[in-house]
Amino acid sequence: MAGNETIETFLDGLASSAPTPGGGGAAAISGAMGAALVSMVCNLTIGKKKYVEVEADLKQVLEKSEGLRRTLTGMIADDVEAFDAVMGAYGLPKNTDEEKAARAAKIQEALKTATDVPLACCRVCREVIDLAEIVAEKGNLNVISDAGVAVLSAYAGLRSAALNVYVNAKGLDDRAFAEERLKELEGLLAEAGALNERIYETVKSKVN
């Protein structure tokens, strides 16, 4: 989302026939909502006498979650830029052998970026999940369900962005590059999946 774009405007764009914003932007905003909910739990815990012992920890979490929220929000534009670069590369002329070679090189360059951008989103969503675990354990019990929604939102963002990694990595000729990214992605998914289940159960036990 642009700096002053409303959520309604973003969703109108998402629903339109325009190719961007698309799933990559939705993944980033899902992660950003997770980070925002982590911040919410922190803000509703800090300053409460009952939670004075964890206040210092949650102030640190809050600083990190706000940084991650800004990063993820910025990734919406990164996704659009990466998509546009791929489409632009495919649109290059291919009338001569030289043009074909230049076009192929540009496509591969753009696909590498289009693989790395959603992978970066996955990494940041993974960080949000770590912070969600902290607030699920230490946060104000009155808003502990929001910690659960935080982890679910971040996990959804990670898994959603992962689909774009798969799509773009598939088209790469540099298989070593692709396999390196896919290996990292599988690790992120495995770690986040286990954490997602654990944190959800932690939150559920506190609200029941």
Swiss-Prot record:
GO terms for molecular function: methenyltetrahydrofolate cyclohydrolase activity. GO terms for cellular component: membrane. Disruption phenotype: Mutants are unable to grow on either methanol or ethylamine in the presence of glycolate. Glyoxylate restores growth, but only on C2 compounds. It is a single-pass membrane protein. It holds the Pfam family FTCD_C. Belongs to the cyclodeaminase/cyclohydrolase family. This is Methenyltetrahydrofolate cyclohydrolase. It comes from Methylorubrum extorquens (strain ATCC 14718 / DSM 1338 / JCM 2805 / NCIMB 9133 / AM1). The gene is fchA.
